[in-house]
A protein has these predicted regions:
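Amphipathic, Lys/Arg-enriched alpha-helical "gate/interface" segment within cytosolic domains
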Residues: 1-126
Length: 126
């Protein structure tokens, strides 16, 4: 689980990668998995200067339910000061109403992309 949250390098830039389905395992309790990942993620992101983190959240294969979204909501607020940009990939399985709820609660855009390379290019396009 520790390598589900890690910095990668893309075209010479550091990007914080969060893989919800790291290893391709489908969790029996998505909310518990997100809580565990949240600790790792917040530990990583809060060590960085404000406004500096490029974040790629990979939801490929993840199944989010209402409980998982409730766990995710405060994380989207707590990480905000540290982020320069964030992008989500693999969100096809997140119901639109839950995605819109996350955007509304966090008061930020959550750009979605079909593939990682697209998301990474967008993160660096600033």
């Amino acid at each position: 689980m520790d390598d589900a949250v890690r910095f990668i390098e893309y075209k010479g830039k550091r990007v914080l990668l969060v893989e919800l389905m790291q290893g391709g395992r489908l969790p029996s309790n998505p909310a518990a998995q997100i809580k565990e990942l949240a600790k790792l993620f917040l530990d990583s992101v809060t060590r960085e200067p404000h406004g500096s983190v490029l974040l790629l959240a990979d939801f490929t294969g993840a199944q989010l339910d209402k409980n998982a979204v409730e766990v995710l909501k405060p994380i989207l607020v707590l990480d905000r000061p540290y982020l320069k940009r964030s992008a989500w990939v693999g969100t096809e399985n997140i119901p639109k109403t839950l995605y819109e709820h996350l955007k509304s609660f966090s008061r930020r855009e959550l750009p979605r992309f079909k593939i990682r390379e697209e998301a990474l290019e967008w993160l660096l396009s600033d």
